[in-house]
Amino acid sequence: MAWLSADIELIKKYRKLCNQFKGGAMCGRYYVDDETAKEIEKIVRSVDEQLKKEAARDIHPTECAPVLVASGGDLRCEVKRWGMPGFMDKQLVINAKSESAMDKKMFCEAVEHRRLVIPAAGFYEWNRQKEKSTFTRKDSPVLYMAGIYSKYEDGDRFVILTTAANESMEPVHDRMPLILEKEEILPWLTEGRKTGEFLGKVPCQLNRTTEFEQLTLF
């Protein structure tokens, strides 16, 4: 597997943005933590003590976040903003359905030419009773969400691809992020002929923790 190009300036930029941005739709918030940073660091093959110490934070729409993109035959870590402007005034689009993205004017070119991966420690979802659940991988501290991005005057913006919920997600929502395995990252980014196959995949089963389960007196 090719690896991320070490780019200290991008890492510094991400650290600066993390300090700047503190902080209905499916997967409207996700989060990164020190394990996410460590995983990115492994792929980048660079050691940056400040990134290791990056405080856990939630990523909200309109904020900037680290993503993985293809760079030649390798991978690269960049910082892009979450959410694309919609066709209606002040509309923000943060997700795209994997089943129909290739047929949508807004997304089809990005699906073909500008795919990316969003690393996260987990993501949140709320049910109809407004109860919050946290979803994480069972076998890894980091999950990789498939996404696409487009270029705008104010910089690159991305959306998270979603698919039908699997058994672990169905009790809370009928949609979930399109989650990739680590070994699928490079093929998703570089092998266009496999795009349709990836868009139709069923994500792995996830751990779910409800908000009341996260509360403790100790």
Residue positions per predicted region:
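Short linear sequence motif anchored by a di-proline
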Residues: 2-218
